[in-house]
From Swiss-Prot:
Pfam hit, one: DUF494
InterPro entries: Smg (IPR007456)
Name of the molecule in the record: Protein Smg homolog
Gene: smg
Disulfide bonding pattern of the chain: none
Stated family: Belongs to the Smg family.
Tree of life domain: Bacteria
Signal peptide: none
Taxonomic lineage from the root: Bacteria, Pseudomonadati, Pseudomonadota, Gammaproteobacteria, Vibrionales
Length: 159
């Protein structure tokens, strides 16, 4: 599954501060050896390229300047099908605590919709948010807070 590949790459190369300059062929070979399917590998690499392109494009900057900070996001039918009520509520929560801006929220939604999956849940959304925040310069504090939210939930809350 594409989401599994993205999480594998994020944990192996990005989150672990491993060497980021890996040749695509070398990366594909490693993913094949790890048991992933060629077509899923290709889709995941395209997804990552599109994330990088979003970060560099002016499209989202233009969108965010047009959206008032107090506005409410209206989701399309296809977005609501992919992002259930819990996911949409979590996105709103992250905006309210300033982890996501309107720009990064739109990037997250774009990348969620770029996934080719019928099964998507809150934990998947959290990983997508981490990937987006990691790839957008100037979001280090938001990334750290999101990382804490993700790992605190996974490890359980200590008393």
């Amino acid at each position: 599954m594409m989401m599994d590949i993205l999480m594998y790459l994020f944990e192996t190369y990005i989150h672990s501060d491993a060497e980021l300059q890996v040749e695509q062929d070398e990366l594909e070979d490693e993913l094949l050896r790890a048991g992933f399917q060629q077509k899923d590998i290709y889709k995941a690499l395209v997804w990552l390229e599109e994330l990088a392109a979003l970060q560099q494009s002016d499209e989202h900057s233009a969108i965010s300047t047009c959206i008032a900070s107090a506005s409410t996001r209206i989701y399309t039918a296809s977005e609501m099908q992919r992002l259930d009520l819990e996911c949409r509520g979590f996105l709103l929560f992250l905006e309210q605590i300033n982890v996501l801006t309107t720009e990064t929220r739109e990037m997250v939604i774009d990348r969620v919709m770029g996934l080719e999956t019928n099964e998507f849940e809150l934990e998947d959304l959290k990983w997508i948010i981490l990937m987006v925040l990691f790839n957008v310069p100037g979001n280090e504090n938001a990334y750290t807070l999101m990382e804490e939210l993700l790992y605190t939930k996974e490890q359980g809350i200590l008393h």
